[in-house]
Each structure stands twice: as structure tokens, then as C-alpha cells.
Amino acid sequence: MPSFDIVSEITLYEIRNAVENANRVLSTRYDFRGVEATIELNEKAETIKVTTESDFQLEQLIEILISSCVKRDIQHNSLDIPADSEHSGKLYSKEIKLKQGIETDMAKKIIKLIKDAKLKVQTQIQGEQVRVSGKSRDDLQATIQLVKNAELGQPFQFNNFRD
């Protein structure tokens, strides 16, 4: 019985490259000259800390980070950007979390989406991934297209294809 897994993974070396590119762009930007501004990656906690002197510059810094992520083929919705910023002394900061794995609520949304489409496949949650199996490859390909076209707020990859 053919099957595949739906996962949500980010390659950390691509994130590291995106953060380094954003820091390079930051060092050449005229509007950030003489301003204390940093973009730091914490790989163990899977977070990116963005710090600068004003709220407006913080938003500009996040735009720089998002554009460098997009250039590295990292979708911007894989970054969980908080709405409000932390303010301490003269610095504003945001701690951006990286979305890794599929949480149970999101997995249930994916399964409901597939069930509502009435495709002849079986789904099951396995930790931080969703296993989809069916009798026909065509049904599996239709499921992949359905999940790709759905706006669920998180990027998904499809791997572990088995025949």
C-alpha cells in the first residue's frame, strides 16, 4: 500500500546562512549606521533574536530577515513572529521562533482537510508528522496537491514515499 509522510522541517544551516546574509545586509544599510542592531540565531532553542533601538527599525530588521530567508528558499510563514516587541532600556527586541514539526492541532486540521475532500486515503498522526496511505498513487498525489494549496499557515514537506 503506497504511503508518504507530511512533515514540517527547516534546515538549520539554511537558517544560519539567512541570518548571516541579513547581518551582512544590515552592516551595509545606510539607515542602520551608528545604530545598535543585531540579528542572532540560537540553534539549540531554535529562535532568532532581533534587537535594535526603535520599534520602526525593528520592523525594518524583520523585513531584512524575511527577505534573506526567502532568498534561501525558507518560507516566511515558517517563522513565528510575535506581534508585540519587548522593550528594555533603550532597546526593542523580538524573539522569533522557528516552526519545526507539526503540532497536534495542526495535524488534526490536516486530517480534517483530507477527510472533507473525501479522498480514499487513510491518515494517522505519528509524533510530529502525519502518515498518509492509500491504494492508489493518484489519490496520494491529489492529497499532496490538496495540502500544498491549503493555506494552513505553515510550510509542509512530503517525504518517505513508499510503494
UniProtKB/Swiss-Prot annotation:
Q: Which CDD domains match?
A: YajQ_like
Q: Does the keyword Ribonucleoprotein apply?
A: no
Q: Which ranges form a coiled coil? A: none
Note the SS bond partners.
none
> Matching InterPro entries, A to Z?
DUF520, UPF0234-like_C, UPF0234_N, YajQ-like_sf
Task: Give an example GO cellular component term for this record.
Answer: cytosol
Q: Which GO terms describe its molecular function?
A: nucleotide binding
What are the alphabetically sorted keywords of the record?
Nucleotide-binding
Classify the source by domain of life: Bacteria
Q: Function of this protein?
A: Nucleotide-binding protein.
Which family is this sequence assigned to? Belongs to the YajQ family.
PANTHER family, A to Z: UPF0234 PROTEIN YAJQ
The protein here is known as Nucleotide-binding protein HSM_1099
